């Protein structure tokens, strides 16, 4: 009888302990992130020091709108931006479509907005047509005998970082679709679309891939740039750049951040600032499926 009592007590204790252990091992979902301050990341499409000066006014506007301290971070390249999102050191990122897809597929970022901008005509003049896409272009010197993509074989071509949508992925994928392999051209990587054009004008490269139309950015310093160069190819439409956030950001703050950027873009001061940084003229809501074509081109290059 005593032995039976002892066995019953032992079983009860075992069940209780086991139950407590199972409770401890239950994985509770992580709480959504509610920021006390925000770090906004930017990628240089021009000289980093110039960009840093341009983003400072936006820093203050965002802080006023969101009522939290905001600081800016100029990432060295797309990879460091994605790593910043993964490590939660960057909360909001101005990133290209390709970088967004890489960050999202790595469970590091969610897209909030894509930018809107005015189309630029073939002479570098801004039209009044506001769109949510742009194109990449391949530019050569006017006196060059390069007139088609096939002519780029064995030529020195300036490209951006490997995660750049218009400066690497789309132009390279376009070449590959035409049967020109990566090894068929001499790739020279540059930092900044303006630097690629300068390398072209200085005869350091024979062609350069830029967004359409990066030449307009150099028009002030080189009024003859359109007479000195020609475009031999323009790609298919590319979704505009994104404003994305770390993937654990709370829905409340996602909405708050989206609203802040849209509201800022509707003010005269705010519109001037965002236009000065990347040429953005406003923002619209975006969803992940908007970037499926970007994934397709990314896979071609990979």
Task: Show the residue positions of the predicted features.
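An extracytoplasmic/periplasmic, membrane-proximal ligand-sensing/linker region
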Residues: 21-22, 32-41, 46-63, 245, ...
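Short beta-strand->loop
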Residues: 109-131, 186, 219-237
């Amino acid at each position: 009888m005593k032995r039976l009592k002892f066995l019953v007590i032992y079983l009860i204790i075992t069940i209780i302990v086991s139950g407590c252990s199972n409770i401890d091992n239950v994985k509770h979902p992580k709480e959504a992130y509610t920021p006390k301050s925000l770090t906004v990341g930017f990628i240089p499409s021009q000289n980093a020091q110039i960009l840093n000066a341009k983003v400072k006014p936006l820093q203050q506007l965002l802080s006023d709108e969101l009522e939290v301290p905001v600081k800016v971070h100029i990432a060295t390249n797309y990879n460091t931006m994605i790593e910043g999102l993964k490590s939660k050191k960057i909360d909001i990122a101005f990133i290209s479509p390709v970088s967004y897809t890489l960050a999202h597929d790595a469970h590091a970022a969610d897209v909030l907005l894509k930018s809107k901008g005015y189309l630029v005509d073939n002479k570098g003049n801004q039209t009044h047509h506001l769109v949510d896409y742009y194109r990449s272009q391949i530019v050569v010197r006017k006196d060059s005998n390069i007139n088609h993509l096939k002519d780029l074989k064995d030529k020195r071509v300036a490209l951006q970082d490997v995660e750049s949508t218009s400066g690497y992925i789309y132009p390279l994928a376009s070449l590959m679709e035409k049967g020109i392999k990566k090894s068929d051209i001499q790739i020279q990587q540059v930092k900044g679309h303006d630097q690629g054009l300068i390398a072209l004008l200085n005869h350091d490269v024979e062609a350069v891939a830029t967004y359409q139309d990066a030449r307009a950015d150099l028009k002030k310093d080189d009024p003859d740039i359109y007479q000195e160069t020609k475009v031999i190819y323009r790609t298919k439409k590319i979704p505009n750049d994104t404003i994305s956030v770390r993937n654990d950001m709370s829905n409340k703050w996602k909405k708050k951040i989206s609203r802040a950027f849209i509201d800022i873009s509707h003010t005269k001061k705010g519109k001037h600032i965002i236009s000065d940084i990347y040429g953005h003229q406003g923002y619209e809501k975006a969803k992940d499926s908007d970037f499926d074509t970007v994934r397709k081109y990314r896979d071609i290059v990979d």
